[in-house]
């Protein structure tokens, strides 16, 4: 067996950082919220062998944000018309029916109802 070369595998001394002043703090990274992990999970359920580029993910994230804002605004408007201060699942359901066309609205309402039922039974 050949002898090991000196220095190979030897641990290097840790570099010492310059001491910070008492007022200096490391800047905390701001969190960017997105729907990308959820979009990815749904995509893998529907098409397990398909990938998605970061640009396509950005477009999908913008789309989900846009639809969310439209539904929230419409639900808020409906609650205001009925002199209610709370947006309930009824307002959201009506907003979805108003915003989405035909069959898409029916599917969205049924999936939403299913999600709300699952949530209430798990509590």
Swiss-Prot record:
Q: Where is the composition biased (Basic residues)?
A: 9-18
Q: Which InterPro entries match?
A: Histone-fold (IPR009072), Histone_H2A/H2B/H3 (IPR007125), Histone_H2B (IPR000558), HISTONE_H2B_site (IPR055333)
Source domain of life: Eukaryota
Record-given protein name: Histone H2B
Alphabetized PROSITE patterns for the sequence: HISTONE_H2B
Q: Which family does it belong to?
A: Belongs to the histone H2B family.
Region entry Disordered: which residue ranges?
A: 1-32
Chief place of localization: nucleus
How is the subunit organization of this protein annotated in UniProt?
The nucleosome is a histone octamer containing two molecules each of H2A, H2B, H3 and H4 assembled in one H3-H4 heterotetramer and two H2A-H2B heterodimers. The octamer wraps approximately 147 bp of DNA.
| Keyword line | Chromosome, DNA-binding, Glycoprotein, Isopeptide bond, Nucleosome core, Nucleus, Ubl conjugation
What Gene Ontology molecular function terms does this protein carry?
DNA binding; protein heterodimerization activity; protein-containing complex binding; structural constituent of chromatin
Q: Where in the cell is it found?
A: Nucleus; Chromosome
Cited Pfam families:
Histone
| Chain's role | Core component of nucleosome. Nucleosomes wrap and compact DNA into chromatin, limiting DNA accessibility to the cellular machineries which require DNA as a template. Histones thereby play a central role in transcription regulation, DNA repair, DNA replication and chromosomal stability. DNA accessibility is regulated via a complex set of post-translational modifications of histones, also called histone code, and nucleosome remodeling.
